[in-house]
Amino acid sequence: MDPASIWGNRWINSNQSIAKKYMETVCKKQSLVVLAADKKTMNELNKLIDDVGDYISALKTHVDLIDDWTKEGWRDFVTKAKEKDLLIFEDRKHGDIGKIVREQMGGIYDSKSWADLITAHSVSYTHLTLPTKRIV
């Protein structure tokens, strides 16, 4: 499926790389599904990718809810998600001034390095440039 023929004017008029990436992924996988990956362990997250990764377009994660989180384990999870052509949507809802939010996107979880999208409250939006790859 060609994104331009499926999405029409949305594709043509979009100037956001993440929107186009999502539309391309949807067309490739023939799925609009963004699955809330509200799991508590790395094993549960990895099993979720094994079970449904071929049938969804994106995972919405909460990295700070993972009880057994390690940098290496999360890196392996991200690699596995990318191998399945999944976008990763980190649901953080950052809501501070831009400088603080940028620092929060680094930190122990370093979400700016692996998330395709990160949620933020509108109080922050004027100080941030999305998608996350442009923040730093």
Spell out what each predicted region is.
Residues L86-S122:
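Glycine/small-residue-rich loop that forms an oxyanion/phosphate-binding "nest" at active or ligand-binding sites
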Residues H127-V136:
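Single conserved hydrophobic/aromatic residue that forms the stacking wall/gate
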Residues D67-T79, I97-E103, S122-L128:
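Active-site-adjacent beta->alpha loops and helix N-cap segments on the catalytic face
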Residues T41, D91-H94, T132:
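Short, glycine/acidic-enriched loop or turn micro-motifs at the edges of active sites
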Residues D2-E83, L87-F89:
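Conserved N-terminal beta1-alpha1 strand-loop-helix module at the mouth
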